[in-house]
């Protein structure tokens, strides 16, 4: 049996029997593929191509819209930054003006307080001076009254007392 198999495969041969080699079946299949496959695959490929082109067009449109929105956002950002810088500079100017106004008011208030203190001091000094003059005059009168009764007569004493009282009323 081994020898019959060995001799059957001895050499290369071509089988020209069309029915045994399935050449007709292959020709029918190839012809069917050639005739019907381009329409079927062509339709599928065309639909796929159209879908891809539509997706690309949609992506390009979205990219354009995104670029437009980005440019608009950049412009708005630049505008907002300019406004923020203007607000910052206005705030600095306002803060400086408030600081200067506050310093001016503080200096004026200090001058007013100093002036008030000086006026109070002058008034107190004047009052003390007046009081000291009165006390000195009173003491002088008392001393004079004690020493004068021996030196002056009654008429001179009355005259002197009247003048002293008049002088005290003037102060």
From Swiss-Prot:
It is found in: Cellular thylakoid membrane. InterPro entries: ATP_synth_B-like_membr_sf, ATP_synth_b/b'su_bac/chlpt. It is a single-pass membrane protein. One of its GO terms (molecular function) is proton-transporting ATP synthase activity, rotational mechanism. Its main location: membrane. The keyword Iron does not apply. One of its GO terms (cellular component) is proton-transporting ATP synthase complex. The chain crosses the membrane at residues 12-34. The keyword Isomerase does not apply. Keywords: ATP synthesis, CF(0), Hydrogen ion transport, Ion transport, Membrane, Thylakoid, Transmembrane, Transmembrane helix, Transport. F-type ATPases have 2 components, F(1) - the catalytic core - and F(0) - the membrane proton channel. F(1) has five subunits: alpha(3), beta(3), gamma(1), delta(1), epsilon(1). F(0) has four main subunits: a(1), b(1), b'(1) and c(10-14). The alpha and beta chains form an alternating ring which encloses part of the gamma chain. F(1) is attached to F(0) by a central stalk formed by the gamma and epsilon chains, while a peripheral stalk is formed by the delta, b and b' chains. PANTHER family: ATP SYNTHASE SUBUNIT B, CHLOROPLASTIC (PTHR34264:SF3). F(1)F(0) ATP synthase produces ATP from ADP in the presence of a proton or sodium gradient. F-type ATPases consist of two structural domains, F(1) containing the extramembraneous catalytic core and F(0) containing the membrane proton channel, linked together by a central stalk and a peripheral stalk. During catalysis, ATP synthesis in the catalytic domain of F(1) is coupled via a rotary mechanism of the central stalk subunits to proton translocation. Belongs to the ATPase B chain family. HAMAP family: ATP_synth_b_bprime. This is ATP synthase subunit b. It comes from Prochlorococcus marinus (strain MIT 9211). The lineage of its organism: Bacteria, Bacillati, Cyanobacteriota, Cyanophyceae, Synechococcales.
């Amino acid at each position: 049996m081994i020898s019959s198999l060995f001799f059957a495969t001895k050499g290369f041969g071509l089988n020209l029997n069309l029915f045994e080699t399935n050449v007709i079946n292959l020709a029918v299949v190839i012809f069917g593929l050639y005739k019907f496959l381009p329409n079927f695959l062509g339709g599928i490929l065309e639909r796929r191509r159209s879908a891809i082109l539509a997706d690309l067009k949609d992506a390009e449109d979205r990219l354009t819209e995104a670029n437009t929105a980005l440019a608009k956002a950049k412009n708005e950002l630049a505008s907002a930054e300019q406004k923020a810088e203007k607000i910052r500079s206005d705030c600095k100017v306002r803060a400086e003006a408030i600081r200067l106004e506050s310093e001016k008011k503080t200096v004026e208030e200090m001058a007013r307080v100093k002036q008030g203190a000086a006026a109070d001091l002058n008034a107190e000094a004047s009052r003390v001076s007046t009081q000291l003059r009165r006390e000195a005059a009173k003491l002088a009168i008392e001393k004079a009254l004690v020493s004068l009764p021996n030196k002056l007569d009654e008429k001179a004493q009355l005259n002197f007392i009247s003048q002293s009282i008049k002088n005290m009323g003037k102060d």
